[in-house]
Amino acid sequence: MARAPGGVRRRSGRRGAGGGGAGGGGEALRKGPWMAEEDEVLLEHVRTHGPMDWSSIRSKGLLPRTGKSCRLRWVNKLRPNLKSGCKFTAEEERVVIELQAQFGNKWARIATYLQGRTDNDVKNFWSTRQKRLARLLRGPLPAARPNKHNSGKGKAPSSSSLDSQTATFHQSSASLDQASLEGNSLGWQCREAAPFMGYDQACSGFFAFEGPLPLQLLPPADGEASSSNAAQSAPPPLLFDQPPYPLINFPGWPERYVDVGHGFVDAGAMDGLAYQELLPMVQSVPMIMPFFGMECAHDAVKHGAFDDLPPNMFDDAVDQPPPPPPPPPPPSPSPSPSRDDVL
């Protein structure tokens, strides 16, 4: 080192002895991505000398890379026991948390306690963990406000709301149908009716009753439930223009003229030629009273049904002239004038 005039030191000597640069050959340093040929040279150096003496790689002219670049390439990419792409295990996370509390952000030092992990792996893990904890501490994000452009009156409802409305509609319809069915099944019940005539049936042979009394349709009593279905307990309505004459039990009656579903004669069975075929059968059987369930037995009528009555029973009621009208009342006398009126 030569001293310049005036006491100022001046650096002297040749620059870059040996043809420029310590690496020999005057080759410039290379930066950027590594090539496959460079990785092969670095691996061969490690197999020969071990993972050390990184500066000698450039001094020997093996690679135009610095010692630091060669070391980082080996540690982060070329080591055989690297766990690249693997998540940290629970044990590794525990070690990183404890060592970070002890050493601080010394990632290279912490990585020496984890086999197959680099300082970059430890640093990335810690940064991701801190961000996740920050999101948890902030709590759930507030609900997004509806956009003014999308919150118009013509906004279509969501599929979930449509499904809930459809389910509610079907449930209401099912409830209404069930209530209607129960009302039809419990609305009318058959009960035995009381005798509708009060005369002595034993003394009168004009009508002959056969079988039980007819059934009358009455509304159900309070709290009374019917176990039968609607088809059994709710008879079809009576149409007065076509009275239902039960003809199923008549002997020899053709089945084609009987409505098996309700037990009544078809409405059109008496039309045309069917009338000529059914008329003898109708005349050969006793007549059935449609509403009272009574049979008119002509044989039961006695020719002398009135023999027991007294002979003069109808004398007073037959061939007697009407009684004469009563005489008119006499006229009432007019009042005589008083003495005061005359004076």
UniProtKB/Swiss-Prot annotation:
Region (Disordered): 1-30, 137-169, 219-238, 307-343
InterPro entries from the UniProt entry: Homeodomain-like_sf, Myb_dom, Plant_Male-Germline_Reg_TFs, SANT/Myb
Top-level taxon in the UniProt lineage: Eukaryota
Entry keyword set: DNA-binding, Nucleus, Repeat, Transcription, Transcription regulation
Function: Probable transcription factor.
One Gene Ontology molecular-function label: DNA binding
GO CC annotation terms, alphabetical: nucleus
Residues of the HTH myb-type domain: 26-78, 79-134
A family per Pfam: Myb_DNA-binding
Biased composition (Polar residues): 157-169
DNA-binding region: 54-77, 107-130
Name this protein carries in UniProt: Probable transcription factor MYB58
SMART domains xref list: SANT
Gene3D superfamilies xrefs: Homeodomain-like
Compositionally biased residues, Pro residues: 320-336
Subcellular location: Nucleus
Positions with biased composition (Gly residues): 15-27
